[in-house]
């Protein structure tokens, strides 16, 4: 049985000004309403973008005590003050100018969002991570990208980030063409984390244009689980689900604290992640990407320290040689032998540029048993001798 205390004063009136077309805002509004449902001394009204003018006038007459909103520009602040609000809680933003009222802010935990995406890719044994942020480089997008970069480094994975061309805002076609080139050049297989679902759709379109197979060559994850996007893309889109409802509840809780307490400012608070909804963009049902990733990991580990064969690589991948050869070529664009050779040549270049190891010993330290063969191969690949390479690097 729920106990409702007897109210001795007028209930607090909270106004939620959120964009109802977005799932995030709808679920946050639900969290705010849930707070009011279990706190009988609180009343809530919802005020969305596009609300008719006469309805806004009704809110002024209603005299809200505080407001929860997702915009913090000067015009919005002045309008909020015109409603007579004594306090405000901003969602994923801070006031653009000094505010006379009491205020606090609640943010999605962008580090937790990035971590959820990274865990999916790590669980698929992907060794190459990539990030695509918003075109406008929003602060929350930058924060997600930075966190994802750190997680990739901590996992020993390569990392790439798409940078929109400077003219992207004026030429969308050029920006999307650059994205097509970028996804085509990524090392495969890879996991691409997009800052939001709308941006993830751009990635899926770019992969289709670049003939990058999803999920065999690239797995893609967005954020927000906007079902009108995620269920209609081809393939369907996996997405991280922030706990928006919890965020709304926290926002209401903070607003009441501002209205009933003595503090004029509250420190930033965050809400976390519910989980990840996996759909076809990360569902490698045949295990192709995982098989190739295991093969690549084996090559990176042993190619330069022992005389490994393609049969050894197939055994380490848990696949037959014939199947691995087929899938390795399809996913990476190169053969297993080419991958072994590339790993060894990378070690040669590293020893030449970063150490004083005698050239006569470098072949053996890099997995090449025949120095004469190495010298010919090196010249063919780089267009110079090993000695000249060292001198220039």
Region spans (language model):
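Bacterial carbohydrate/catabolite-sensing allosteric modules
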Residues: 1-68, 76-316, 321, 325, ...
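A secondary-structure capping/hinge motif
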Residues: 328-335, 376-389
């Amino acid at each position: 049985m729920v106990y409702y205390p007897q109210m001795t004063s007028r209930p607090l009136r909270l106004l939620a000004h959120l964009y109802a077309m977005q799932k995030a805002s709808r679920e946050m509004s639900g969290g705010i309403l849930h707070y009011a449902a279990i706190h009988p001394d609180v009343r809530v009204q919802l005020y969305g973008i596009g609300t008719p003018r006469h309805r806004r006038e009704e809110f002024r007459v209603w005299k809200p005590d505080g407001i929860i909103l997702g915009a913090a520009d000067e015009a919005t602040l002045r309008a909020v003050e015109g409603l007579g609000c004594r306090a405000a809680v901003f969602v994923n933003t801070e006031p653009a100018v000094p505010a006379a009222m009491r205020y606090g802010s609640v943010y999605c935990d962008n580090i937790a969002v990035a971590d959820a995406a990274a865990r999916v890719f790590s669980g698929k044994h992907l060794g190459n991570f990539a990030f695509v942020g918003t075109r406008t480089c929003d602060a929350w997008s930058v924060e997600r990208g930075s966190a994802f970069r750190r997680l990739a480094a901590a996992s020993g994975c390569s990392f790439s980030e798409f940078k929109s061309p400077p003219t992207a805002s004026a030429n969308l076609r050029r920006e999307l063409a650059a994205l097509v080139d970028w996804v085509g050049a990524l090392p495969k297989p890879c996991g691409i984390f997009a800052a939001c679902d709308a941006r993830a759709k751009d990635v899926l379109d770019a992969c289709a244009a670049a003939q990058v197979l999803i999920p065999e060559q690239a797995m893609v994850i967005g954020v927000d689980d906007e079902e009108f996007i995620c269920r209609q893309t081809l393939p369907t889109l996996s997405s991280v689900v922030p706990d928006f409802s919890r965020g709304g509840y926290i926002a209401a809780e903070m607003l009441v604290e501002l209205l009933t307490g003595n503090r004029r400012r509250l420190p930033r608070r965050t809400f976390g992640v519910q989980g990840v909804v996996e759909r076809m963009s990360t569902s490698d049902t045949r295990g192709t990407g995982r098989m190739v990733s295991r093969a690549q990991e084996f090559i990176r580990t042993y190619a330069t320290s022992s005389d490994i064969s393609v049969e050894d690589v197939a055994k380490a991948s848990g696949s037959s040689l014939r199947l691995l050869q087929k899938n390795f070529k399809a996913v990476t664009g190169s053969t297993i032998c080419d991958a072994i050779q590339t790993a060894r040549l990378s070690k040669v270049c590293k020893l030449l540029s970063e150490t004083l190891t005698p050239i006569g010993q470098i072949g053996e330290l890099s997995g090449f048993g025949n120095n004469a063969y190495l010298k010919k191969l090196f010249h063919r690949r780089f267009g110079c001798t090993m000695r000249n390479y060292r001198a220039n690097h």
